[in-house]
Amino acid sequence: MNKQSWLLNLSLLKTHPAFRAVFLARFISIVSLGLLGVAVPVQIQMMTHSTWQVGLSVTLTGGAMFVGLMVGGVLADRYERKKVILLARGTCGIGFIGLCLNALLPEPSLLAIYLLGLWDGFFASLGVTALLAATPALVGRENLMQAGAITMLTVRLGSVISPMIGGLLLATGGVAWNYGLAAAGTFITLLPLLSLPALPPPPQPREHPLKSLLAGFRFLLASPLVGGIALLGGLLTMASAVRVLYPALADNWQMSAAQIGFLYAAIPLGAAIGALTSGKLAHSVRPGLLMLLSTLGAFLAIGLFGLMPMWILGVVCLALFGWLSAVSSLLQYTMLQTQTPEAMLGRINGLWTAQNVTGDAIGAALLGGLGAMMTPVASASASGFGLLIIGVLLLLVLVELRRFRQTPPQVTASGS
C-alpha cells in the first residue's frame, strides 16, 4: 500500500499472475454466493414466516463452516493445496445445484435447505483455509498486507453487486434463478484456479491435529493483545448477523423485493469504501485504540439502524457500519500478522477466521430468538446497543490493546 495516498495500491494484480487468477475467481465466487445469500433467507421467510427459522439456517451453515475451517487447516498442511481448493469449489457447486432443484419442486423441502446449507458451509470453508495457506506462496510474505486489503475490496465489491442482482432476480424469476446462477458461477471459478501452480504443503513433522489446535487456543488465551483482537472480531461479526432481520424489517418498511437487495448491499458497500481508502491505516501510531473506537462506532450504527423511520436511512446506517467494520477488520488483520509468532501464524489465522464464523452464527441465533419475542425494530436496536455496552467495557478492560503503539513505517520512494 502507498503511504503517500489514502487509496489502496493494486499493483499486485499486475505483477503476480497467480494472485490475479485468485482475484478473478474470488470475485466471481463472491457474486455467486451473494445471489445465494439473498435467496436462502427470503425463501425460508416465505415458507415459514419465522425469523427464528431464518436465523437457524445461518447458524447451521456457520457451524458447518467452523468445522470445515478446522478440518481444512489439517488438509491444507498435509495435501497439495491446489487440489484441495479445486475439490472444495466443485463440491460447493453440486450443493448449489441441489438448492436449485429443490426450489423448482411444487413444495420445496425446508429440511433440504438446511442440509444443503451444512454441505455448502463445510466444503466452502475447506477451500477458504487452503487458499489462505497458499497465499504467502502466491504473493510473497512481504506483500501479505497488500494482498489482504485487495482481497477485502474484492469481497466487498462483489457483495455490493450480487445482492442487488439477487433482489432483481427474486422480483422477476424467483429463487431458483438465484440458485442456478450461483451454481454456474461457482463452476466458472474453476477455470482461473486451474492456472495456479502446484501448491505443495511445507515439509513438517507429523503432529496430531488436535494437539496443534490446542496449542493455538493456548496462545490466544495467554496473549491479552492477540486474544483481545480475536474477541473484538467475534463481537463485530455478531453485529453483522443483523441481516437475518432484513426480510422482517423489509415488511415493516413496506419494501419491494428489488429494494430488499439494497439492505444486503449496504454493509458491503461501506466496507468496500473502507478498504479502498485504507492506504494509511497501516501507519496508525495507536492501531489498538483506533480498532476499539471503530468497533464501538460500528455497534452504535447497528443500534440506530432499526430505529430509522425510512428504509433509505437504514441503508445509510448499514453502510456506516460496513465502513467502520472494515477499518476495524483491517487493523485486526495487520496486528495479528505482526504480533503473532511465525510458527503460529497459520493456526491463529485459521482460528481467527473460525471465531468470526462462530460469532456470525451466534449472532444469527440470538437475533432469530429476539425476533420471535420482540419486534424486528426492537431486536435490531437491542443487539446494537447491547454490543455497544460490551464494547465500552472492553475499552476499559483491554488495557494492553488500548495502549499499544507502533512505529510508523518509513516512506519509500516507490510508494509500494
Swiss-Prot record:
Keywords assigned: Cell inner membrane, Cell membrane, Membrane, Transmembrane, Transmembrane helix, Transport
Residue stretches spanning the membrane: 22-42, 56-76, 84-104, 110-130, 157-177, 179-199, 219-239, 257-277, 288-307, 314-336, 357-377, 379-399
GO cellular component, one term: plasma membrane
Membrane topology classification: Multi-pass membrane protein
Keyword Transmembrane included in the entry's annotation: yes
Main localization, broad class: membrane
Protein's cellular compartments: Cell inner membrane
Periplasmic side stretches: 43-55, 105-109, 178, 240-256, 308-313, 378
InterPro entries, sorted: Enterobactin_exp_EntS, MFS_dom, MFS_trans_sf, TM_effector
Topology feature Cytoplasmic, residues: 1-21, 77-83, 131-156, 200-218, 278-287, 337-356, 400-416
Name of the protein this chain belongs to: Enterobactin exporter EntS
Similarity comment: family membership: Belongs to the major facilitator superfamily. EntS (TC 2.A.1.38) family.
Protein purpose: Component of an export pathway for enterobactin.
One example GO MF annotation: enterobactin transmembrane transporter activity
Pfam families: MFS_3 (PF05977)
